[in-house]
Each structure stands twice: as structure tokens, then as C-alpha cells.
A protein has these predicted regions:
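Phosphoinositide-binding peripheral membrane targeting modules
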Residues: 56-95
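Acidic, Ser/Thr- and proline-rich intrinsically disordered linker/docking segments
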Residues: 2-47, 54-56, 91-129
Length: 129
């Protein structure tokens, strides 16, 4: 599990993410799965360790999720910066309560369940499978 700054393309960071999560799915796999990415979701809260590593940006923060062969990547958009949080499937826990929460390796991120929940419900069921 790692948190990477992917605002600018960096081949070393890309290699690390691919080694940890597996290479991105090819076109045929993407079609078979019915898509590998969520729509953007509104972030409600982070765990403290993610808050410390990411920027302090006021206003609404968004994230989307990408499926990979060995785990998921949560792309966190904060202003002009983008961070990628990699979570292997064996460390992934998903909770559905007042908020939709993803836990991995002792960290978590909470998403608002308003509009984005309805738009992403089908995709989020793929993660649970």
C-alpha cells in the first residue's frame, strides 16, 4: 500500500504502481468487466496519515477508483494535484453505512453517499466481488 503523487508523469512512480497493482487491464478485459473506473466521488473524510501526506486544500475534494489485477487505485484530486493510493485486494475492506468507506492497511477514506453513490453503485459492487 502506498500513496504516490501522480500530478506529473514519472516513469519510476508508474513502475512502482504497476509492480504493486499489476499492469492496467487491456481493452478486451476492460470491455469484459464493463469498465474499470468509477465516476468521481465526493470525499468526506480521510484518516490522519493520508491527511498528513496530502495537501491541505479547501473546498470539495474528489476521488475516483480504478480496478487493477492485484488491487485498486484511489485517485485523489486536490486542486491541481493528484495522488494515487494503492490498496491490494488482500488489505481492502469496504464499509457501507452513513458514508461509503474504503479501508486498506490501517488507513481509510470516506465518501459522501449523495449523488455519487447512485452513479457508482454498480461499479462498487465489482470491488466487493
Amino acid at each position: 500500500m502506498g500513496l504516490y503523487n501522480i500530478t506529473y508523469k514519472n516513469k519510476e512512480t508508474e513502475k512502482e504502481i504497476n509492480a504493486e497493482m499489476g499492469k492496467p487491464f487491456g481493452l478486451i478485459e476492460k470491455l469484459k468487466l464493463g469498465g474499470i473506473g468509477s465516476r468521481r466521488m465526493i470525499i468526506e473524510n480521510f484518516s490522519e496519515d493520508i491527511k498528513n501526506l496530502t495537501l491541505k486544500v479547501s473546498g470539495i475534494q474528489y476521488a475516483n477508483i480504478e480496478l487493477r489485477p492485484n488491487g485498486i487505485i484511489v485517485h485523489i484530486n486536490q486542486g491541481i494535484y493528484t495522488h494515487a493510493w494503492t490498496i491490494p485486494y488482500f488489505r481492502l475492506s469496504v464499509f457501507n453505512g452513513d458514508f461509503f468507506t474504503i479501508h486498506g492497511g490501517g488507513s481509510h477514506i470516506q465518501f459522501n453517499k449523495e449523488k455519487s453513490w447512485k452513479e457508482n453503485k454498480e461499479f462498487l459492487q465489482k470491488i466487493v466481488k
